[in-house]
Every structure is written in C-alpha cells, then in structure tokens.
C-alpha cells in the first residue's frame, strides 16, 4: 500500500491543510482543502475513507464581450487584480485566521496560457515567502482527474478530459495517467467557444454553456445538419467540423439561399436555425468522444467512465455517455457539477496535497517556472499503487 504520510502535518495535529490557486486560462480559482489523518493512514495505507473536506472554493471569471475571446495579457491583468481578494475570501470562508497554519500552497504549473500562469505563480511565491509555507507545483490535468476521483469515488475509471484547451482519453497504469487518445488539433471547448464567437452569443457564464442552452431549444432533433465526423483510431480532429459549421452559420446570417443545406431549393424557405446548428454540432462532437472512450474502455477492460473538465458539465454529453455505458456490463458514468468540472482552486489543492503527503515539494524557486505545455503522462503518480 502507498504510504501517504511521508510528510507529517506541520501543525502536529490530525489533519493537513492545503491552499490551491488555479489560473491557467480565464478563470481564477482559490480553494482550501483539509485531509484528515485517519488511523489507517497512520499505518501507511490509502483508501476512499480519506474524505477531503472542502473548506472554501472561490472563483472569478474574466468575461469578454460577445464575439470576442480572451487575450493572455488581459487575462493575466484580471488575475493580478483579483488574486489577493480571492485568497482573503477563501481564508475567511475556511475559518483560517493564521495562514501560517497551512501545510502547503499549491499552484498550477501548466499547461495553460503563459501570462495568466505567471500571474498565479508570482502570487504563490509571495505567499510562500510571507507565511513560510512550502510550495507544490501541480499539473492542471492531474488536478481535474484527482478532484473527479475524490468527489465521485470512481475506483479506476477511464477518464474523458474535455475542456477549452484539452481533449484526452486517459487510463491509469503503473504510476502514470496514460493518454490513449486525444485531439489532433483544437480542443472541444475551443471548438465550441469559437463557434459561439461566430454566433456572437454572450460569454457569460461561458460560451459552451450558452451553446448547450441553444441546442436544447432545437425543434428538429430528428434531422441533424450534416457535418464532418473525423475519428482516426483513438484520436479525433475538430478543426474541420468547426470550419464547416462556421461557413454554414455565415451563410445563414447572409441568407445565402444557394446553400441548399440551409434553404429550400425551390421556395428559398429557411430550413435550419441557429439552434439546429448548435444541436448538430454537439451531437457530432459528443458522438466522436463516446466512440473513442468506448474503445479505450474495451482496451483496458473497464466499465467506468469519469468525465472531467469544463465541457464535462454538459448534460447532453453525460446522457450520451450513459447510454453507451448501459450497453456494457455494469457500466457507470461519473461526473461532477460546475463547482468541480470548471477550473477551480480546490482541485489544485487536492492534487497538490497528495503530492505533498508523498514528499513532493518545491525545494527552490527555479522549480516553479510555469510551462504552457505539460503533458498529463509526464507526471509520476506516486500516491497511487
């Protein structure tokens, strides 16, 4: 069994406290987490009885006007302006009067956007020096996985990680989260966000959420708009489907009646709405994800799927995955709500605290340099058998 007590609580008590800061994209999150030191852990074993207690989970999102994305420099400015306020709120909500009682400060090292990541690491270094608390550098993707495992209690699932910057099918083996399949170009969240910009729909609370709401309003669900479907073995491509549906949307707005996918050849009557496009886009993208996830489940002989990442909040994706799992013996789908699917600080605290308890801490600030490219399978998962 894994010994999770290589480092004892700094307070000498029966629990560990971790503060996590996430800021790899347009969401800035600060969370505080407590791990109890149960009797079985004192003997060196790890089980799901080690229930993490979430003391605070604060988040603020940098939102741009409809039709616009977010630039790294502007996002970084947002994070710098808000990080102190969020940390203070998190400490108050957690009931921590003296931050020196924290065992560890965890921050996102990557992957993500360079400037926002740098804003977060500067804040983490500053707090570490002010309060004399050690640092742990966390892989953003590992944070999503470990938070999902903790909340859902999924034992050893195939993980579908779907977000604005990542699309991966992952399974655990020999102390690594192995990537079985992934996008060959853009991530699914990026595909949805860019189509939302084409439609000029609001970015509040998020473009993907607003596309989901439009898709629910589709009245022609028995008639999909034909779109590219690109699955290559265990990998998939979404740039072609985005280019095609962007072209359709522009023809719809221009009322290009020569596009017979959208308008009746004889009468010129509009056949397709924006809601139809959103619905068809979701159905095609999610079908591709379900296909490669099922293939991974068959390969590793698993009957569980854990969906993590911001797009994992999508109810339709969860429904389609559940439908696939029902056709497999004892198939199960695990997912969390928007508190934990969307980027947050507490997921960084969870993964970081597991690393800390295994003795993985930053020994020098040179180890805190952030990186925009940080693969999920680069991390040695010492806290699992």
Curated annotation (Swiss-Prot):
Q: Where does a divalent metal cation bind?
A: 140, 144, 161, 343
Q: Which is a Pfam family this sequence falls into?
A: TsaD
Tell me its EC number(s), please.
2.3.1.234
Give me the comment on cofactor binding.
Binds 1 divalent metal cation per subunit.
Annotated keywords: Activator, Acyltransferase, Cytoplasm, Metal-binding, Nucleus, Transcription, Transcription regulation, Transferase, tRNA processing
List the GO cellular component terms.
chromatin; cytoplasm; EKC/KEOPS complex; nucleus
Subcellular compartments: Cytoplasm; Nucleus
SUPFAM superfamilies, sorted? Actin-like ATPase domain (SSF53067)
Which InterPro entries does UniProt cross-reference here? ATPase_NBD, Gcp-like_dom, KAE1/TsaD, Kae1_archaea_euk, Peptidase_M22_CS
Q: Which GO terms describe its molecular function?
A: chromatin DNA binding; metal ion binding; N(6)-L-threonylcarbamoyladenine synthase activity; nucleotidase activity
Task: Provide one Gene Ontology biological process annotation.
Answer: tRNA threonylcarbamoyladenosine modification
What this protein catalyses is: L-threonylcarbamoyladenylate + adenosine(37) in tRNA = N(6)-L-threonylcarbamoyladenosine(37) in tRNA + AMP + H(+)
Required cofactor(s)? a divalent metal cation
Name the residues that bind substrate.
161-165, 193, 208, 212, 314
Q: How does it assemble?
A: Component of the EKC/KEOPS complex composed of at least BUD32, CGI121, GON7, KAE1 and PCC1; the whole complex dimerizes.
- Entry similarity comment: Belongs to the KAE1 / TsaD family.
Q: What does this protein do?
A: Component of the EKC/KEOPS complex that is required for the formation of a threonylcarbamoyl group on adenosine at position 37 (t(6)A37) in tRNAs that read codons beginning with adenine. The complex is probably involved in the transfer of the threonylcarbamoyl moiety of threonylcarbamoyl-AMP (TC-AMP) to the N6 group of A37. KAE1 likely plays a direct catalytic role in this reaction, but requires other protein(s) of the complex to fulfill this activity. The EKC/KEOPS complex also promotes both telomere uncapping and telomere elongation.
| UniProt name for this protein | tRNA N6-adenosine threonylcarbamoyltransferase
